[in-house]
Amino acid sequence: SGEHYMEHFHHAGGVPKLMAQLGELIDLDARTITGQTLREVVANAEDVPGQDAIRSKANPIKSEGAMAILHGNLAPRGAVIKQSAASPKLLQHTGRAVVFESVEDMTLRVDDPALDVTADDVLVLRNAGPKGAPGMPEAGYLPIPKKLARTGVKDMVRISDARMSGT
């Protein structure tokens, strides 16, 4: 969410500067691996005049946070959505689930012309996260089925237990 890269974040003061901006929202008495408290780390945060990669709470990029926590029948213990990357029209959606049981299952079926899927359905990829796949592969990207893409579908609700980068 924003125009900057991680290197800009680093040069703007990095995690210590971000924690300084969070202030009372974090436990500043917690100890780090070095034995310092977060309060001590924050006190030593570099102040970089003119940087705009790390913004204050009073000057956010968006009025709502980039991330949100979801709860419901698909995620009874909670899930995370990067709502800043989601199409606003899809943030509230009801649809039929089209479930892929693994990355291999998805790869074999997602572009099959016989796949029973519509633009209003929800694509679900299971068993690709830390428990279902070895390690934590970046396997969370679910492509739009080709038969829908050919009709102009550019986005639809896609859910995965896998790690995703960027969006």
Language-model regions: role of each:
Residues 1-167:
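Catalytic or ion-coupling anion/metal-binding cores of large enzyme and transporter domains
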